[in-house]
Amino acid sequence: MLQRAEPQDFERVLSSMCTVPHPSAREAAERFLATNPGDPGTYETIAGLEREAVEYLGDITGLSDPAGYVASGGTEANLQAIRIARNRADTDDPNVVAPVHAHFSFTKAADVLGVELRTAPAADYRVNMAAMAELVDEDTVCVVGVAGSTEYGYVDPIPAIADLAETVDALCHVDAAWGGFYLPFTDHDWHFGHADIDTMTIDPHKVGQAAVPAGGLLARDRTLLDELAVETPYLESTDQLTLTGTRSGAGVASAVAAMESLWPAGYRQQYETSMANADWLADQLSARGHDVVGPELPLVAADLSMPMTDELRDRGWRVSKTGAGEMRVVCMPHVTRSMLRSFVADLDWY
């Protein structure tokens, strides 16, 4: 079976928030396949590269002295952020307040960690701050904002969310897993330099073009990560703050290689190209009579019918739906104008 199998190509993938790794990231991943950053005392080189990855992520997110690590992905990073918030709080009945459009990983985190998840409704695809304010109380341990939502690519009012968290002595966590590598080239207020954010998720293996797995968790204050530490008596290091023990050195090395190659000029060019493609597709769909959610980042959602979407899937296009039923197209780095022209041509055939 393996000898006959071919890896997934990206020629018709329009639904994924992962993409083709940068050539330098691919080469670095292959070189460090057998390394484990979970044992930094033994694998000193990859431990050093992980520190470099965190420094790059801090530069991208406005954090001059970043703490954090390279995680398996956004789900782990979000769970760990909630774990930090729960562990530091003085309450027996912790709750987390998040937008209704927050990633489903927060549902997982609430289940695993035994915290209540309260969701605030959205207004115009961003969290309704008045509704969110009604949900926080003295047992709120974390208030979450999303910087580039999975369904629509919209950015919540992060400074207002951080201010709200401060009123109840809760942490503020921002999920920028997908949007974090696009947002530096926009006018949005979304990062540590814009607001009193405590923790952030940002994934190099999405728009950052690292190889999977390479997520990222950042913290403003290193003492926050102490909430995650457990003793490791049989390793060369004395404690560990990551969720998984063995981790991918390939992911760490590829993240450094990608960011070294692309930050900032390459990512800026990538954003401009992807945003232009999203705007072009939105115009094409709108001209054909579809209601389109105007793209704020390179993601287009439109009201294509389920039969139409099914036909596109039958023709090999990988597309997905929002919770409300719109078709969504994520204009990742591998998505070209030529691809989108072919997509629209198949849409016209229907």
From Swiss-Prot:
Pfam families: Pyridoxal_deC
A GO term for molecular function: pyridoxal phosphate binding
Keywords: Decarboxylase, Lyase, Pyridoxal phosphate
Residues modified as N6-(pyridoxal phosphate)lysine: K206
GO biological process terms on file: carboxylic acid metabolic process; coenzyme A biosynthetic process
EC class of the enzyme, as a word: lyase
Pathway: Cofactor biosynthesis; coenzyme A biosynthesis
EC number(s) from the headed UniProt entry: 4.1.1.11
Catalytic activity from the UniProt record: L-aspartate + H(+) = beta-alanine + CO2
InterPro entries per the UniProt record, alphabetical: GrpII_AminoAcid_Decarb (IPR050477), MfnA (IPR020931), PyrdxlP-dep_de-COase (IPR002129), PyrdxlP-dep_Trfase (IPR015424), PyrdxlP-dep_Trfase_major (IPR015421), PyrdxlP-dep_Trfase_small (IPR015422)
Cofactor(s) the protein needs: pyridoxal 5'-phosphate
HAMAP family the UniProt entry points to: MfnA_decarbox
Protein family (similarity comment): Belongs to the group II decarboxylase family. MfnA subfamily.
Chain's role: Catalyzes the decarboxylation of L-aspartate to produce beta-alanine.
Designated name of the protein: Probable L-aspartate decarboxylase
Organism: Haloarcula marismortui (strain ATCC 43049 / DSM 3752 / JCM 8966 / VKM B-1809) (Halobacterium marismortui)
